[in-house]
A protein has these predicted regions:
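Charged, low-complexity interaction regions
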Residues: 30-44, 58-68
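Short amphipathic alpha-helical heptad-repeat segments
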Residues: 14-25, 41-53
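Short intrinsically disordered terminal tails
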Residues: 1-7, 79-83
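Repeat-associated, polar segments at repeat-unit boundaries in modular proteins
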Residues: 62-83
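A structural signal for well-ordered alpha-helices, especially hydrophobic packing surfaces
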Residues: 26-29, 57, 78-82
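N-terminal regions of proteins, emphasizing targeting and processing segments when present
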Residues: 32-33, 50, 54, 61, ...
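Short stretches within intrinsically disordered, low-complexity N-terminal or propeptide regions
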Residues: 10, 37, 41, 72-75
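N-terminal acidic leader/helix
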Residues: 3-35
């Protein structure tokens, strides 16, 4: 994504996508998502979504959006090791 400021619509879409990443990370960790996938696939999904959240949280054009769930998922995802 470029350094240009995002529109309100883009911010809303990005925030929604962040919620999907949070849900996936938490779901993989609690076993409710990707349970039938290999440990490598689960780990890869968590790692990619953690990276996505880190990039998005670091953006400076957010307004009053609450990043608590994203930051919690980043922490949980970094601690996760698929087995």
């Amino acid at each position: 994504m470029s350094d240009e400021a995002r529109t309100a619509e883009q911010l809303a879409q990005d925030y929604t996508a962040m919620g999907h990443s949070v849900d996936l990370i938490n779901g993989v960790i609690d076993g409710s998502q990707m349970a039938d996938e290999s440990a490598e696939d689960r780990q890869g999904a968590v790692d990619r979504n953690v990276e996505h959240l880190e990039l998005m949280v670091a953006k400076t054009d957010w307004g009053s959006e609450d990043m608590t769930a994203a930051n919690s998922a980043i922490t949980a995802g970094k601690a996760y090791t698929a087995s």
